[in-house]
């Protein structure tokens, strides 16, 4: 299970980066993104579920890939 950030939905609130800073960061435009190399394995990280719930616009999603 992996995690993704939908850049079209992201408003840059940064809740995911605050909740799971070792999985998420914010780019130069302030939009959230998954840290390089963490996309495929981050779904099992203990705080990713919290980050998914914390996103105010639902831009952070778990994928079954």
UniProtKB/Swiss-Prot annotation:
Cofactor(s) required for function per UniProt: [3Fe-4S] cluster
Function: Electron transport protein for the cytochrome P-450-SOY system.
Cofactor note: Binds 1 [3Fe-4S] cluster.
Alphabetical keyword list: 3Fe-4S, Electron transport, Iron, Iron-sulfur, Metal-binding, Transport
An annotated Gene Ontology molecular function: iron ion binding
Transmembrane segments: none
Taxonomic placement: Bacteria, Bacillati, Actinomycetota, Actinomycetes, Kitasatosporales
Domain 4Fe-4S ferredoxin-type, chain residue ranges per copy: 2-29
Name of the protein in its database record: Ferredoxin soy
A Pfam family reported for this protein in Swiss-Prot or TrEMBL: Fer4_15
InterPro entries referenced in this protein's UniProt entry, alphabetically: 3Fe4S_ferredoxin, 4Fe4S_Fe-S-bd, Fe-S_cluster_ET
Binding site for [3Fe-4S] cluster: 10, 16, 55
PANTHER family in the cross-refs: FERREDOXIN
